[in-house]
Amino acid sequence: MTPAENKALRESMGLTLKWLATRWGVTVQSVKRWEGSRTPPPQIAKDMLDLKRKFDADVQRLVENGDEVVEVPRRDRDCTGSEQSAAWARAVAQRAKEQRGLTMEFRDAKGAEKQ
């Protein structure tokens, strides 16, 4: 996986540099290098491809089983246990929207004020 492919894949799934750095136990700077001038180590490239498979499975599940209106989290703290991050959930829903034409609305945490 080239640095450009690594970055494009991360962005397409709505993942942040910080989220990946935490997942891999490295610094944000290391993740930036793997998207800049250095090829990611094989285990990092494998994990990115594993995340992509999960992302695609989440999209397919939403396409096949989702409602016409899908609620997505506005912030990470509004996520359910199955979502990687709010941006991930929105990216999954957007991809499903492109395939099936569903509508997205924000889901806010219970008791939180709508913004």
Regions found by a protein language model. Name each.
Residues M1-S12:
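A short, Lys/Arg-rich alpha-helix, primarily the initiator
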